[in-house]
Amino acid sequence: MEDRRPQKSCDEAIGSLVRQEYEAAVAHSTEALLAMGPRTPTPSTALLRTRALLYRIAARLQLKDYDQADEDCKHVFAEELAKGDGSFRAGLQSLLLDGSLQEVCSVLSKALYGEPLNGIMTKDMTRLKRLLSEIEAARSKVVFSEENEEDVQEGWQFRPPPRGVTSSEEYTLCKRFLEQGLCRYGAQCTSAHSQEELTEWQRRYASRLIRLKQQQEGKHFSENYMEALIEKWINSLTPERVMNDCVDGVTVEHSSDLSITVNTKKSSHSWTFTLFCKPVRTLQRIALLYDANRPHFSIAAVSAGDASALEPQPVCPGGCQEWSAASPVQNGMDHCIYTVEIAFSTEIFGTFRQTVVFDLGCEPVLMQRVMVDAASIEDLEHLLQARQQLLMTAKRWDSSCKTIVEFVPNENMDLERSLLTRYQIPLSADQLFTQSVLDKTLTRDNYQPRLHDLLYIEEIAQYKEVTKFNIKVNLQLVTSFMLTGISGGAKYAQNGQLFARFKLTETLSEDTLAGRLVMTKVNSVLLLPVFKERMGQNQPAGAKERVYEALIEEKTKDYIFLRVCKECCDELGLVADQELQVELQFQLNRLPLCEMHYALDRVRDNSILFPDISLTPTIPWSPNRQWDEQLDPRLNAKQKEAILAITTPLSINLPPVLIIGPYGTGKTFTLAQAVKHILKQPESRVLICTHSNSAADLYIKDYLHPYVEAGNPHARPLRVYFRNRWVKTVHPLVQQYCLISGAHFTFQMPTRQDVERHRVVVVTLSTSQYLCQLDLEPGIFTHILLDEAAQAMECETIMPLALAVKSTRVVLAGDHMQLSPFVYSEFARERNLHVSLLDRLYEHYPSEYPCRILLCENYRSHEAIINYTSDLFYEGKLMASGKQPPHKDFYPLTFFTARGEDVQEKNSTAYYNNAEVFEIVERVEEMRKKWPVSWGKLEEGSIGVVSPYADQVFRIRAELRKKRMSEVSVERVLNVQGKQFRVLFLSTVRTRHTCKHKQTAIKRKEQLVEDSTEDLDYGFLSNYKLLNTAITRAQSLVAVVGDPIALCSVGRCRKFWETFISICHENHSLHGITFEQIKIQLEALELKKTYVLNPLAPEFIPRALRSQHPPQQGPGKHQHSPPKAKGQLANHTEPFPPEGFVQPNAAVLMGNPIQAFTPPGAGAPASGKSPSPVQRLDPGASILYVPAVYGGNMVMPMPLPLPWAGYQSRFPMDPRIMSHQAAMYNLNLRPAASRTSPVLYGFSHASPLGLNQQQNTEKELLQEPSGNGKMDINGKAEHCRLLTPERKAPELKEKQGDLESVQNKSPEPQSNMGFPANRLIRKDPQRALNFHMAPPHPAFPSHHGTSQFPQQYGLSRPPLRMQTPMHPQASSFPPSFYSGPPMGPRGLQSPVLEGGEDPMGAGMSEDLKGVVRGLPAQMHQQPLRLNSFGEESLDSLLGDTLDGQASSGMDALQHQQQARVGQWGEHTPFLPAGVAPFPLPQQLAHLAQPGLRIPPQILRAGWGLGPAADEEPRPTMPRYPGLLREMLPQDQQYEQRDPAEMPPPQSRLLQYRQQIQPRSPGDLPSPSSSAPNHNFPAPAQPSYPDTSREPPVGFSQAPFPPDHSAGPLPVKYLLQEAHWPHPGHMLGHGLPFGLQAMAQRQDPGPLQHQQQKQQLQAPQSSLHSLDEYEPRGPGRPLYQRRISSSSPQPYPDSLEPQDQPVPSYRYPSADLWLGGPGPVPGPAPIHNIPCNGASHIGPHREILVSKAMSEEQMKAECLQPPPPPPPHPASAASLQHHGQFPPLLPSKQTPPDPGGGGNTSPAGHPKPPTMSYASALRAPPKPRPMLPEQSKKNSDPISLLQELSIGSSNSSNGYYTYFK
């Protein structure tokens, strides 16, 4: 009994600990210790004693009883010392295994490292730390052994699940396997093959997560310190007080630039930071925060002391990731100095970032950021050159708009003309969308109609694609040209015709999708001469322009040669040897598609195509046949089996015989041998069809010609060539077997007699249709052999089958695992138009079917390559039979790590990754130096480089050419089928940086459809056929260059890659990273580490784009704290592009749909604002950047500035993908502005060569969006201003006072300081939207005071009249802040763009002007502000219209401009120090006034929506609920949403919040979803009388210190009316709430500069209430946090009588910035950290609820309204991710009242955060139901066709909405 007592007490102690009853825990532990007494312990009691002591230590730490805890710690170690035999650690291990120490562990680590300010710092914690490290050491042993035994121990039955999953909901069932019982991916499939497997995967994920979490909690204290610090920063009420880049009393100097470039791959660098502390501070800890690049950085040395002497401190040899001070420095002086050396080293290319944290014993801790680019020094200038061809998308030329002069003579035969006429695209919906198309599968019954319709749909998609190619080129006119090489020869123009040659650029190469279409499916062009003057003279007015048809005569790699007809030459007076500038439109060659239609109609018997497999055919076998001496001895067993099947007597009916074999297994050899045997049968006749001419010629050159020459004239083949093929281009040996007309040297079509005279006819699939036209009776060919059958669509393959009957032996040979033919229509691709007949039959036949023969001996590749492809793609059936010599240094499967960032150029659909470019070039050089003799001569084609993306191909090719290695073949994978290389390099390009899991409901099907957009877009990461095609090109070596973590965690091929990398690891051919590191990073990713990624960080701008500008602060400069004139970090330079940077045109519009380009976030923070310790995306950690918790499907539209009028109206708008025109941005896709997420890489660390950059600066100068959605052109966000704690909610909203502050009477474009005006002008203007052309409204007269402005408006209902007096509003910043040159105010702001003001204002100081002028004029035009436009919210509109009133003209302009410069108060190349910040007066108080009614004009005006919006009900945005509650009922008709449409709550955290914290209308100030920047100057024109349509345009101006005035700005640029492309309100967007768009104005509008990049903006006010928001990501949790803990009333002014004077408002003095005395910051409500998991089209996220409703609901729920907290400005920048979070307003909740409702309660009732960020991460997510509008596509054919004809194009790739 005695023995049981201590055990029982220990159990009770741990129970109390878990229940957080710490006194009880101490009591129970003491009881256990007393029960054991002082007697000599046995091993079991010793363990019990240790356990009791540990529990007591934990409890005492929680009770803050540190001394007693330390005392207990002594006893623990005393026992260990007494024994000294290692039994102590063994005991700890056993305790860890049974889970007894979990609680102790977490208490210890939290107490020691999680809460540095709770008093513990004054104690000596050495023993406790040692105790924790002992427990850690024991745990790591336990975990290690567990991990190794995991699979065995758990006894899992199914395949291991795919990696890189961040939620068990991401596992899916394999639709294909369930439907067909067959999956091409086999064991490598990333979807489960049964419900049981799926369940097991989810269980495995959960158990692994638990294990990882335990591991993480037990991590060594340093990691816990780092995670605790970041979590604290994320959850902090005042994040800037947790971490900051400046700390009071500490000055930081650094020895070299914090951002450097190293130009060798193997390189190292170190930085020395000197911290000068006065008064003395103790440096307690230094840590490196950023997990991803840990292996590359370390703390090398630390010294401490004073100015006279520094003493080195102990640091681990070789450096460490975290350093703790052993003892405090006591030098008795008033200051101390620390020096810290941070070392960096790398052996791979990439971009590496790290954040160094210095903990000086109090918060905020100091942090500094460093970055290294490891890049090749080779400049990439040629890649930045503008593409020469101007791409245009204009109206297609046809007889309705142009007179088309056809080419004479027309060479089409009568039959071809009749085909073109017969198969016209049907125009009516019921003809195109028949039931057969909507059927799920192809059947014998729907065969013809379904394929006809899909072909028409594909033709429309090709047509759309080719319309993108209107190019302006210079034609060189010649009378003859010559081609060299085997197909060489000269061509001469005759009969008055001429040849014209033009050069191909990358735009038109086969490497791009549309280029490929032009090169393969276009054979004529229409040309329009550009010299209009000459043309205009002889053309009558109103006559249609004449365009001329020219034929494409020849296509080479570099040039296209046209044949120009005589009529054109005569009319235009063309002569040879001159140049002619023309506009070209390519004409799609419809003939091949018409021939496919014809082939479909010619197939008489479908049964050949749908063989009955219920009866297994018998292939007679006999030893004589198997070992026939006449069979070639080189045939292997499987090849002989194939020949037996092919030569089976025709009396035995066989279904089509499939000869399946990968590249190199001898398919062609087998078929050729079979032909010889067939010809031995009497009456046999063979038709050989191939997909390509080269393969057809191979049969003749290699097999039939030698056979005929050997004395077999009966085997003489007839080779049929396309009649227009130039004879010279055909091999002379093959010409012997062709029909050539003696006179014209052209090929002739065979006659029926010609065919009957030959027993072997060789054709390509396309020329086989000539045979069908000869009236040959079906069955004339006894055998039809189709080689390369997997590369042709089924509609092509059946052309020769028109000649087949039931008894015809049909043989299809090919590789079903190679690339399928490309289909441009996604709709048709989904319906398997691209699937070959071979592929379909392969799946149709059972696995052991005798007519499905797999050739399995590969003769061309090394055994290791064969084994890999065999296991992964061919069910393990392949064998290596050839002897390919390996390389002595490199295993045949080798992996080189490059951790760059994949980038998408502005107008391109492709990606590139410069780190991989440099790595490949270096490895190719190395391979050439180490070329083994056994590989033979190094020649052209020995080394191949393949990549899925054209942009990467161009870059690698250019880099290799520079190094004189042009013999290396660099191709897209699509172009290497049929080729082979001794060594093959694969550049995978993609990283997790841009690849997000597509987990939205609408995209879920992407995982199930093969060759889906994801396959195209993710390249090697998702398309297994692409991967197989590439790998099987190699003979001796496959070397992959890429990011291993991305490959193993993204896309459907991740399990293939995991296998590849593990093979490399086992064979020591994994370079640049270890397998362990990969596993660790994958686990970190799956654990959703909170600090791997800063989701709010801005896009990184490489140094290459900013080379001309010196850094603002060089080495040795000081960072003062608090910052007095500082905006960006010391090492940040302004991101301007290099001189001569030209905007690439939209040339590469073609190809895959424009995909998610890196989501931008925040830029430089305000001084005093906390910068993020978390680095922006690092190429090395790509895998870790985006835990899917941040989202699945972030699609960032990009602007495509297109310099011609009319482009805008070219495409219909699909808001999901519209990527040009501000008007077409779907702003719901924007990421939120950060809460001034720490100064990140937007403008700081440069990558000199475009590593991880968006190459085109127009898109990329990503500045931090401000809280209210505004951005300064000089690269800084407004919410980076000094948002001091003293400002209350009104000021935040008041910020919008300058949204439309002043009407600029001058036509001058106002320019912000920061960009010279000449950089702001774009060729392609956009029409101002009507709202902004509005005249001032009489009811809003401009206010003439410069430093005053009206505080409140009272508005009577219908008429807009002023009812209240204007009150002066004084500035409340000290006078010292108003130093610096004055600057004019902003003008109106347009939804399209914020134009730039002229920097040369008259009031500007001369030195400032000098700086501005100093910029080279040729530099690339800079992006202006893109405004919230597209799908805007009510609140933003109201804010824009009501937030201010007009102020007087020029002096007001000058003052506001001064303020905008001044708000920064910083040194930059454009801003002198000390400019005044922009005061934010309290201005919106009037909005809560009762009786305020918003006139409909205001509601309608300027709304960024068009008609489409009326079709979807959308919740509105309660920015001014008090105001909106007064709307009449008819105005509220859209207030209620159908419950079915209400997106349900998705995160547990949200539900938790709703249960625990009932809300009331008065709870929080209401949010605004996006305050658009409508900034552009109004024209200087008379007012328009018609105010009924126009909203008021009077806007307030913020106050300024007196005595600053300036003259008007000079007028420089105006555009003509003809250049405005937008006719009316908005293309394709409607206004919600049943509002109507304004009528179109004809008056010329003011100038608007084009924005050239997407600014992502969100208002600060959008944070005022966040309980309504819900992340929209599929099953992603929401992270929310409260911002502050005390609550002054939100809108004090709104509760005062209207005529009470408003107290003056001043900025607080500098000593209050960082939290000095003064008003306590008010709480802002909960913060959302945005998830990227957006739907494509998010409806508006908020709902207006009437006041009456709110009151009823409150009564119904008996809710007490909590206090309405105002936001804490310093952290209230919006984090709402527009379009990502549906509203979360359950039926029982109402939006908050901004204070007008009278619900005031005393301040100071904080709501503690209900859940930490980490807990939110861990909360299991719920699946997201589909939005109603997304849940299904319209299946009504008429609607489908209407959409089709409207042309819902994807803007860049010619897919239709319904063709997707």
Curated annotation (Swiss-Prot):
Main location: nucleus
Comp. bias (Polar residues): 1301-1313
UniProt zinc finger (C3H1-type) residues: 168-196
Enzyme class: hydrolase
Region feature (Disordered): 1106-1136, 1158-1177, 1286-1317, 1556-1604, 1641-1709, 1749-1860
Key word Nucleus present: yes
Start-end of Basic and acidic residues biased regions: 1286-1298
GO molecular function: ATP binding; DNA binding; DNA-binding transcription factor activity; helicase activity; hydrolase activity; RNA binding; zinc ion binding
UniProt keywords, alphabetically: ATP-binding, Helicase, Hydrolase, Metal-binding, Nucleotide-binding, Nucleus, Zinc, Zinc-finger
A matching Pfam family: zf-CCCH
Locations listed in the record: Nucleus
EC number: 3.6.4.-
GO terms of biological process kind: regulatory ncRNA-mediated post-transcriptional gene silencing
Single GO cellular component term: P granule
Function: May act as a helicase.
Protein name: Probable helicase with zinc finger domain
Organism phylogeny: Eukaryota, Metazoa, Chordata, Craniata, Vertebrata
